[in-house]
UniProtKB/Swiss-Prot annotation:
Its cofactor is [4Fe-4S] cluster. S-adenosyl-L-methionine binds at residues 72, 120, 172. InterPro entries: Aldolase_TIM, Di-Nase_FeMo-co_biosynth, DiNase_FeMo-co_biosyn_sf, MoaA_NifB_PqqE_Fe-S-bd_CS, Nase_CF_NifB, NifB_C, rSAM. PANTHER family: FEMO COFACTOR BIOSYNTHESIS PROTEIN NIFB, FEMO COFACTOR BIOSYNTHESIS PROTEIN NIFB-RELATED. Residues 52-303 form the Radical SAM core domain. Belongs to the radical SAM superfamily. NifB family. This is FeMo cofactor biosynthesis protein NifB. Keywords: 4Fe-4S, Iron, Iron-sulfur, Lyase, Metal-binding, Nitrogen fixation, S-adenosyl-L-methionine. Residues 1-25 are annotated as: Disordered. The lineage of its organism: Bacteria, Bacillati, Cyanobacteriota, Cyanophyceae, Nostocales. Residues 1-17 have a biased composition (Polar residues). GO terms for biological process: nitrogen fixation. One of its GO terms (molecular function) is metal ion binding. [4Fe-4S] cluster 1 binds at residues 66, 70, 73.
């Protein structure tokens, strides 16, 4: 599984760079995790940025009901064409969900995590949620179990979560100020009563804090998701970040608001915009010195299947997976995982070799590059086939993951669509180069005209990025 090394090629024409510019951002201030914690998340693609290059996850949609109404959410139970939280193609019973997991565990042996994240709240549907976990824990003990919740009912179920060996819990926590919460939540339903405004937000916050503390006491890892909403909580998220760290969260995922009008959410229908890439990164960077930040979130559907950035859910719709025999094979899965871990060791050695001797220099400007990758920590995807680009920051001595940016794939039916290409250019306009396995002459020339160079390679991301940077830095 050693990554092939074939070198790289850079477009011959090199636009002059501004030495004092760079990307105007900084991801260098990071918080490292201790070795024991890294071992616990080593195969969890949502909790580990490195693992998401190699391991897959799946969500099962067994929890339709929700006990709060967020202004950014509109749950849909029969939707196949939207990619966002709260959306599924179909609901499942716990038994159907368990069957689906066993089928996919055989078809995709690198799938290591089963999560329940909706389309409502798992803890507003406790019987279905815990029955599903019980079935999977019994039949597929090597699969990690995790759930995502708004936290309202979390204090009541931490003991049950611990009993089932659910080691990873995500809480969506958008504010620690009830007045701000009143602008985010339409209502909160608690103990058979519906609360609105700041009162509802206060109750939710109290239960979130209680739940977070209870998770810490139970030694259950907690990630906090926060939706960044410009003009409402964007300037407040640094305070949220400090508070959740004090309460025991180990990872913070600040996500952009999705507010397209066609999704039918309150914010979408009232014109509330989401943050720009620059605004999102600025807030993430402000928080990065306080605790570990998650930057590789894909804001998945509640029935997502596959690697992050790869949704294979339509391959396993109910009419299909119910006709498939479970192929779960513990020994085969372990063999696949051993191969992945061997490759990860080789990849780590390759990265260390690339970075060896690279001294950090304050004078080196930082730049962004876009990567076309199918996973594995490699530049290994054709430009025209990419449905997203991973963006990295490079400064000559370090290569740091920044974000992913979704695009429509350029080559459809063998031809490139002009509107799609224009959108790609807009999406990666702040990047100095796009690193791909292959690209046609026409899009290469058009990118160069837009000030974006191309590098063709099939190699370790860090190696290709640093080689480009060295050439770029020479002017």
């Amino acid at each position: 599984m050693t990554p092939p090394v074939t070198g790289s090629s850079v477009t011959e024409s090199t636009p002059t760079k501004a030495k004092s510019g760079g990307c105007g951002c900084d991801t260098s201030t990071t918080v490292e995790m201790d070795e024991k914690l890294q071992e616990r998340i080593a195969k969890h693609p949502c909790y580990s940025e490195e693992a998401h290059h190699h391991y897959a996850r799946m969500h099962v949609a067994v929890a339709p009901a929700c006990n709060i109404q967020c202004n950014y959410c509109n749950r849909k139970y029969d939707c196949a064409n939207e990619s966002r939280p709260g959306v599924v193609s179909e609901l499942l019973t716990p038994e159907e969900a368990a069957h689906k997991v066993l089928v996919i565990a055989g078809k995709i042996p690198q799938m290591t995590v089963l999560g329940i994240a909706g389309p409502g709240d798992p803890l507003a549907n406790p019987e279905k949620t815990f029955r599903t976990f019980e079935l999977i824990a019994d039949k597929a003990p090597d699969i990690k179990l995790c759930l995502s919740t708004n936290g309202l009912m979390l204090p009541e179920y931490v003991d049950r979560i611990k009993q089932l060996n659910i080691d990873h819990v995500t809480i969506t926590l958008n504010t620690i100020d009830p007045e701000i919460g009143a602008q985010i939540y339409s209502w909160v339903h608690y103990k058979r009563r519906r609360y609105r405004g700041a009162e509802g937000a206060r109750i939710l916050l109290e239960k979130q804090m209680e739940g977070l503390q209870a998770l810490r006491e139970a030694d259950i890892l907690c990630k906090v998701n926060s939706v960044m909403i410009p003009g409402i909580n964007d300037q407040h998220l640094v305070e949220v970040n400090k508070m959740i760290r004090e309460q025991g969260a180990f990872l913070h995922n600040i996500m952009p608001l999705i507010s397209a009008p066609e999704h039918g959410t309150h914010f979408g229908l009232t014109g509330q915009r989401g943050p720009s890439q620059k605004e999102l990164k600025s807030v993430q960077d402000q928080c990065s010195g306080n605790m570990k930040m998650m930057r590789h979130c894909r804001q998945c559907r509640a029935d997502a299947v596959g690697l992050l950035g790869e949704d294979r859910s339509q391959e396993f719709t109910k009419d299909k997976f119910l006709e498939m025999a479970p192929e779960y094979d513990f020994d085969k899965r372990q063999e696949v995982h051993e191969g992945i871990e061997k490759f990860r060791v080789e990849l780590k050695v390759a990265k260390e070799k690339v970075l060896a001797g690279k001294e950090k220099t304050a004078n080196n400007p930082k730049i962004l590059v876009a990567i076309a990758t199918k996973g594995g920590g490699l530049v290994n995807q054709h430009f025209g086939h990419a449905k997203e680009f991973q963006v990295y920051e490079v400064d000559g001595s370090e290569v740091s993951f920044v974000s992913h940016r979704k695009v429509d794939h350029y080559c459809q039916g063998g031809y490139g669509e002009e509107a799609t290409f224009d959108n790609i250019v807009k999406t990666i306009a702040d990047c100095k180069a796009v690193l791909v396995s292959k690209i046609g002459e026409s899009p290469k020339e058009k990118l160069l005209q837009a000030g974006i160079q191309t590098v063709e390679a099939y190699d370790v991301i860090e190696k290709v990025a640093l080689e480009f940077y060295e050439q770029w830095n020479k002017g």
